[in-house]
């Protein structure tokens, strides 16, 4: 039996700017199916910019390079098309949507994905039976389904709601942008357990984080350290421990060597 992995994402010399300021200065990254990659780096290094560009945020302009998602040019797709194709972004600060119940929002997103796959839409009752199972992944009470999207949710509840969306949509590529930000240890553990349950040999996950503590619960296959819009170093899980001890200052010397 072949164990060859499928290439999910290939980023080649990606350059990007926002409001005329260059942020990404040549990012290269390859991710295969079944892999978890963590991107770490100091504030302002370009980590969150990279995640938003993958999702198609209109404020960021790609000025060079290419992004291939399952061998297709991701940059040619609108944000909604990327989502339907299997790219999922969990925001650092999930937005609130007044007047839209969580279950209606989730069913719309789920049925849009089904349509993309040529499947029929699910009626509310059938969908409820599916989403009820997924609630167990993130230990959420069913009453959250009837509340407006993220409205009045705590920070931990918002992050768990994002992972619930991920569980339903089963994306090929999930990008978790500082999902650990603002979480206490119990909420972090619940979110991490949910992510670990959803990780499988068919999908890929990018964890973007500033701190090592998330990686105590979700062990990545690769860690990439970003500084000044470039990936300067790649290693295994041990690299996060090195960063915890050394901090990020040593990257300045490494960057000088690579220039």
Curated annotation (Swiss-Prot):
<comment type="similarity">
    <text>Belongs to the ABC transporter superfamily. Ycf16 family.</text>
</comment>
<keyword id="KW-0934">Plastid</keyword>
<dbReference type="Pfam" id="PF00005">
    <property type="entry name" value="ABC_tran"/>
</dbReference>
<dbReference type="InterPro" id="IPR003593">
    <property type="entry name" value="AAA+_ATPase"/>
</dbReference>
<keyword id="KW-0067">ATP-binding</keyword>
<dbReference type="GO" id="GO:0009842">
    <property type="term" value="C:cyanelle"/>
</dbReference>
<dbReference type="GO" id="GO:0016887">
    <property type="term" value="F:ATP hydrolysis activity"/>
</dbReference>
<feature type="domain" description="ABC transporter">
    <location>
        <begin position="9"/>
        <end position="253"/>
    </location>
</feature>
<keyword id="KW-0813">Transport</keyword>
<dbReference type="InterPro" id="IPR027417">
    <property type="entry name" value="P-loop_NTPase"/>
</dbReference>
<feature type="binding site">
    <location>
        <begin position="41"/>
        <end position="48"/>
    </location>
    <ligand>
        <name>ATP</name>
    </ligand>
</feature>
<keyword id="KW-0194">Cyanelle</keyword>
<dbReference type="InterPro" id="IPR003439">
    <property type="entry name" value="ABC_transporter-like_ATP-bd"/>
</dbReference>
<keyword id="KW-0547">Nucleotide-binding</keyword>
<dbReference type="InterPro" id="IPR017871">
    <property type="entry name" value="ABC_transporter-like_CS"/>
</dbReference>
<dbReference type="InterPro" id="IPR010230">
    <property type="entry name" value="FeS-cluster_ATPase_SufC"/>
</dbReference>
<dbReference type="GO" id="GO:0005524">
    <property type="term" value="F:ATP binding"/>
</dbReference>
<protein>
    <recommendedName>
        <fullName>Probable ATP-dependent transporter ycf16</fullName>
    </recommendedName>
</protein>
């Amino acid at each position: 039996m072949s164990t060859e992995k499928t290439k999910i994402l290939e980023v080649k010399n990606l350059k990007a700017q926002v409001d005329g300021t260059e942020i990404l200065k040549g990012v290269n990254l390859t991710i295969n199916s079944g892999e978890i990659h963590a991107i770490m780096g100091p504030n302002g290094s370009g980590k969150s910019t990279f995640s938003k560009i993958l999702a198609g945020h209109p404020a960021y302009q790609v000025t060079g390079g290419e992004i291939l998602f399952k061998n297709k040019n991701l940059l040619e797709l609108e944000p909604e098309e990327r989502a339907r194709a299997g790219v999922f972004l969990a925001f650092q600060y999930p937005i609130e949507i007044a007047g839209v119940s969580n279950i209606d929002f989730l069913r719309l997103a789920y049925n849009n994905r089904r349509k993309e796959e040529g499947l029929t839409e699910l009626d509310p009752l059938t969908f409820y039976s599916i989403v009820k199972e997924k609630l167990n992944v993130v230990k959420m009470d069913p009453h959250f389904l009837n509340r407006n999207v993220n409205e009045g949710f705590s920070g931990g509840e918002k992050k768990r709601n994002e992972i619930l969306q991920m569980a339903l949509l089963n994306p090929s590529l999930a990008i978790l942008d500082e999902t650990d930000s603002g979480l206490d240890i119990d909420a972090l553990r619940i979110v991490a357990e949910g992510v670990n349950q959803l990780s499988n040999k068919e999908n890929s996950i990018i964890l973007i984080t500033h701190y090592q503590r998330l990686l105590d619960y979700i062990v990545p296959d690769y860690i990439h350290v970003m500084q000044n819009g470039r990936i300067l170093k790649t290693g295994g899980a041990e690299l996060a421990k090195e960063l915890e001890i050394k901090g990020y200052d040593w990257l300045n010397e490494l960057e000088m060597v690579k220039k």
